[in-house]
């Protein structure tokens, strides 16, 4: 389900990885003791994906998925007695990614935008990011200028960027920076 069309969401600055949806639960660690049992995967309660293209060439894609809360079993010692209990190892989580690209200048040049969000129920932790990108093919597609810039939207801001300029025909060269 998540593999088909996944390349539309991929880029050098990888903001979204669909393999995290349904992965082995590991969000919470017990405050004491040792994990002795936990599920191998997180249950996906619902998921939807829409991929398409308009007649004007705008490509779009949206993925939204909700995963269940999962519990693990821990073993700990209390007053010299070995005990076991369950603890929340993974809360309900909502994963979202949306992206679109629009052709400009010619059919091989595009600008794009992407937004991601991960929200975990009962947690004051959100992971959101946005990204803008472009691919410009100029001079009969011999000169290529690409770039992207991303930032997080939460308490701990992070930024990333990448620029690349390349030329091909008759010889090839490129300059890139991250």
Tell me what each language-model feature is.
Residues 1-178:
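Outer-membrane beta-barrel channel domains
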